Amino acid sequence: LAAVSVDCSEYPKPACTIEYRPLCGSDNKTYDNKCNFCNAVVESNGTLTLSHFGKC
């Protein structure tokens, strides 16, 4: 089983679009898109990871 991951190297960003492409974080929270998810990853100092694509 391949690990799912997202490249967050260009984050954090000051503003995210309203694009809806949900991702489920390891905190069992659904993030609206990659930008919102990656900003949360940066804020968590890398402790937050991607559980899977789609809603939790």
UniProtKB/Swiss-Prot annotation:
Glycosylated residues: list them.
45
Q: What domain of life? A: Eukaryota
At what residues does the UniProt record annotate the site feature described as Reactive bond 3? Answer: 18-19
Query: Between which residues do disulfide bridges form?
Result: 8-38, 16-35, 24-56
The UniProt record lists the Kazal-like domain at 6-56
Compartments it resides in: Secreted
* One protein family per Pfam: Kazal_1
- Family annotation (InterPro entries): Bifunctional_prot_inhibitor, Kazal_dom, Kazal_dom_sf, Prot_inh_Kazal-m
Do you know which PROSITE patterns this protein is assigned to?
A: KAZAL_1 (PS00282), KAZAL_2 (PS51465)
GO CC annotation terms, alphabetical:
extracellular space
Q: Which residues form a coiled coil?
A: none
Q: SUPFAM superfamilies under this entry?
A: Kazal-type serine protease inhibitors
Q: Give GO MF terms, alphabetically.
A: serine-type endopeptidase inhibitor activity
Q: Which PANTHER family does this entry report, sorted A to Z?
A: OVOMUCOID-LIKE-RELATED, SERINE PEPTIDASE INHIBITOR, KAZAL TYPE 2, TANDEM DUPLICATE 1-RELATED
Q: What is known of its domains?
A: Avian ovomucoid consists of three homologous, tandem Kazal family inhibitory domains.
Q: What is this protein called?
A: Ovomucoid
Q: Which organism is it from?
A: Lophura leucomelanos
